Amino acid sequence: MTLEDVGERAARPEDLSRFVVERLNAGDVEGLVALYEPDAVLALPDGGVASGRDEIRRAYAALVADRPVFTPGEQQPTLVSGDLALTSVRLPGGGVTVEVARRQQDGTWLWVIDQPALPA
């Protein structure tokens, strides 16, 4: 099984935000990693950056270890230009996420850049 075989694939860029909440709540680290391109970057709460799937895997493994519960936010309008999309979600606590997704050769979408929480 490859990462691409893990969970449902994003047919629309907006699907990625829904999938991340579902997989966080399920503790599905491999399913989370499968939402990213191999060389993607993920901003970390401490100001660092996880680069590539191995570092993203470690970051999510640490995050879900305590089994926190995540609540979906309000998906903001997606901006698409060719094979790139800018997605954003307003979180229940007032913060905002910002992500860049890229359309893959099979028509599905994966994140390239993920800023999970900007201050409110």
Language-model features, listed with the residues they occupy:
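A beta-strand edge to alpha-helix "cap/lid" segment located at domain peripheries
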Residues: 1-29, 41-120
